[in-house]
Regions:
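Glycan-recognition and catalytic cores of secretory/periplasmic carbohydrate-active enzymes
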Residues: 1-145
Length: 145
């Protein structure tokens, strides 16, 4: 049996995943998941990005499927933020980037002109996140599909 099929490799992969999920918890922001500064803290000078929020939702949904404690809360936060703050209620689709805080109506605020645009790249991650969260039976995930 080679390294890729070994128990040791599976344990190593599991430790790597758990470490990544632990670090990812610090990316939590009111409207999704944000960028990190070099010191590992949330960067308040950068927007909350659709691709990052979707990727984190995907990762935490995988954690739910693997039974890793604490992942449900983060997966649910991601699904809720994608549905509530990123969705463009006027023109459809999802904003590419939004502010850290919602507006007075509780909706996401596009981050300058860049956030108002729609990128297929980011939407692909949203589909991946929604499908994985649906598989993990997270509330509201199926509606994202």
């Amino acid at each position: 049996m080679g390294w890729l099929e070994s128990v040791e490799h599976n344990r190593w992969l599991s430790r790597q995943l758990q470490d990544l999920l632990e670090r990812g918890r610090a990316a939590w922001a009111p409207t999704g998941f944000g960028y990190f500064r070099p010191d590992g803290h949330l960067d308040l000078d950068k927007p909350i990005d659709l691709a990052i929020t979707a990727r984190m939702t995907f990762a935490f949904s995988l954690g739910v499927l693997m039974g890793i404690p604490g992942c449900r809360r983060y997966a649910d936060h991601g699904v809720r933020c994608l549905q509530t703050y990123f969705r463009d209620r006027e023109y459809g689709g999802w904003f590419t980037a939004i502010d850290h805080d919602p507006n007075e109506d509780g909706h996401g605020v596009p981050w300058s002109d860049a956030g108002d645009s729609k990128w297929q790249y980011a939407h692909a991650f949203l589909i991946l996140a929604a499908a994985t969260a649906t598989n993990a039976n997270r509330p509201g995930a199926h509606e994202l599909l």
